[in-house]
Amino acid sequence: MSDSKVNMVSPPEGLTGEGFFATKLNDVVGLARANSLWPLPFATSCCGIEFMATMAAHYDLARFGSERVSFSPRQADMLLVMGTISKKMAPILRQVYEQMSEPRWVIAVGACASSGGVFDTYSVLQGIDKVIPVDVYVPGCPPRPEQIVDGVMRLQELVKSESVRRRSSPEYQELLASYNIS
């Protein structure tokens, strides 16, 4: 075995002392994105009431970086779809999703958004993943605020580990193409 010697490089002049570390750009960007998600609530039913409780002082979703709830798709990067989505509402949901800028993430909150819930009828969309890609599913009818917080935390983990280049990858473009989203 050879003795390898590590060459320590001295920092540039004026940049000495504590507080410097080396990391990857993906990690820094992922950490920043994960802790500054701006939610856009798309609520149609009782899950929206649970989301209101989640944003209130007792559960305080703001402590996870979702301080500012946006009601403009152009200023949001996390779409929370809550409640029953009718088939007539599906094109509107898709339009809202398309108006969001990249990177954008989707959480399906509750049984109705995830799978249509108990409403297995001709007029109800059986899961929003039929019209837009979903990143995290939160189960429940309606889910408790703790479950919604857990869903946001799971999304944060996904965002932290996502590569900066993922959104321009052929796989991601293929996923969007499968939904006819350009």
Curated annotation (Swiss-Prot):
The entry lists its GO molecular-function terms as: 4 iron, 4 sulfur cluster binding; iron ion binding; NADH dehydrogenase (ubiquinone) activity; NADH:ubiquinone reductase (non-electrogenic) activity; quinone binding
Broadest EC class? Answer: translocase
Q: Which Gene3D superfamilies match?
A: 3.40.50.12280
Residues the entry annotates as binding [4Fe-4S] cluster: C46, C47, C112, C141
Keyword presence, Translocase: yes
Q: What does this protein do?
A: NDH-1 shuttles electrons from NADH, via FMN and iron-sulfur (Fe-S) centers, to quinones in the respiratory chain. The immediate electron acceptor for the enzyme in this species is believed to be a menaquinone. Couples the redox reaction to proton translocation (for every two electrons transferred, four hydrogen ions are translocated across the cytoplasmic membrane), and thus conserves the redox energy in a proton gradient.
Question: What is the name of the protein in this document?
Answer: NADH-quinone oxidoreductase subunit B
Native organism is: Flavobacterium johnsoniae (strain ATCC 17061 / DSM 2064 / JCM 8514 / BCRC 14874 / CCUG 350202 / NBRC 14942 / NCIMB 11054 / UW101) (Cytophaga johnsonae)
